[in-house]
């Protein structure tokens, strides 16, 4: 039995402000830090030995993982991968979700947020929120940096990394923890749970709540559960 643990970062500053965050680097709130520490405690209680830790390039996921590793007293350096980043929200980046609903209409914003293949307008490359203007992304080839993304785009990006980097480790009975984001975890769940394009748009991922997935030798899911049942969301699986 192999274990895969998926953790969406704890509440971020822009989660609290209801702003579209995407690839912008914002940190955790006080509540987000508490969620991350609590996630570490839940993971510690499982007594699972983690072989590899992964996070996105983004501070909120990196710091969530740091709190978890501190709780586990594990000082190993995690693998940071931009491919695990949140979905890029294009021209919506930095804007308030409620204000955009009033301006563009609730249906249009819902389509941007929850549809499978609809993407917002691209973010101008001169905008300070564009990844090309953020220092942490200078190491990424420019052709790999998006101006906007749909959930499908995010799925394609995340899954290429998962198949190339993570899947074989799981097949070799290595236990893995990934600290990432709502949409990058949604992409992983689509693949692992075999959710169709409509069903995946309904999946909600809570902040700072570890999702433990137990896999058999053929990578089939034997069991999956949120470790904090008080804040669990419907996995839409069974």
From Swiss-Prot:
| Full protein name | 2,3-bisphosphoglycerate-dependent phosphoglycerate mutase
Q: Tell me which HAMAP family the record gives.
A: PGAM_GpmA
So where does substrate get bound? 8-15, 21-22, 60, 86-89, 97, 113-114, 182-183
Q: In which pathway does it act?
A: Carbohydrate degradation; glycolysis; pyruvate from D-glyceraldehyde 3-phosphate: step 3/5
Q: Which reaction is this enzyme known to catalyze?
A: (2R)-2-phosphoglycerate = (2R)-3-phosphoglycerate
The positions annotated as site (Transition state stabilizer) read 181
Q: Note one Pfam family from the annotation.
A: His_Phos_1
Q: Name one GO biological process term.
A: gluconeogenesis
Give me the disulphide-bonded residues: none
NCBIfam families cross-referenced by the UniProt entry:
pgm_1
List the taxonomic lineage: Bacteria, Pseudomonadati, Pseudomonadota, Alphaproteobacteria, Candidatus Pelagibacterales
UniProt lists the gene as gpmA
Q: Which family does it belong to?
A: Belongs to the phosphoglycerate mutase family. BPG-dependent PGAM subfamily.
Report the EC number(s), separated by commas if there are several. 5.4.2.11
User: Subunit composition?
Assistant: Homodimer.
- Residues at the catalytic site: 9 (tele-phosphohistidine intermediate), 86 (proton donor/acceptor)
Q: What does this protein do?
A: Catalyzes the interconversion of 2-phosphoglycerate and 3-phosphoglycerate.
């Amino acid at each position: 039995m192999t274990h895969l643990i998926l953790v969406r970062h704890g509440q971020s500053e822009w989660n609290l402000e209801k702003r579209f965050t995407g690839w912008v680097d914002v940190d955790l709130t006080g509540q987000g830090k508490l969620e991350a520490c609590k996630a570490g405690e839940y993971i510690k209680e499982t007594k699972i030995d983690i072989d590899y830790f992964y996070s996105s390039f983004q501070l909120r996921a990196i710091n969530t993982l740091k709190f978890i590793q501190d709780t586990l007293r594990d000082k190993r350096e995690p693998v940071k991968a931009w491919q695990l980043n949140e979905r890029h929200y294009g021209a919506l980046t930095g804007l308030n979700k409620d204000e955009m609903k009033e301006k563009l209409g609730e249906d249009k914003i819902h389509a941007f947020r929850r549809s499978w293949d609809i993407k917002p307008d691209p973010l101008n490359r001169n905008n300070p929120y564009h990844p090309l203007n953020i220092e942490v992304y200078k190491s990424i080839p420019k052709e790999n940096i998006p101006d906007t993304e749909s959930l499908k785009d995010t799925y394609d990006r995340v899954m290429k990394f998962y198949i190339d980097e993570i899947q074989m480790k799981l097949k070799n009975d290595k236990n893995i923890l990934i600290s990432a984001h709502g949409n990058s975890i949604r992409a992983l769940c689509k693949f692992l749970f075999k959710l169709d394009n409509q069903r995946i748009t309904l999946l909600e991922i809570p902040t700072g709540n570890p999702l433990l997935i137990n896999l058999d030798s053929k990578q089939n899911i034997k069991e999956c559960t949120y470790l904090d049942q008080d804040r669990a969301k419907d996995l839409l699986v069974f």
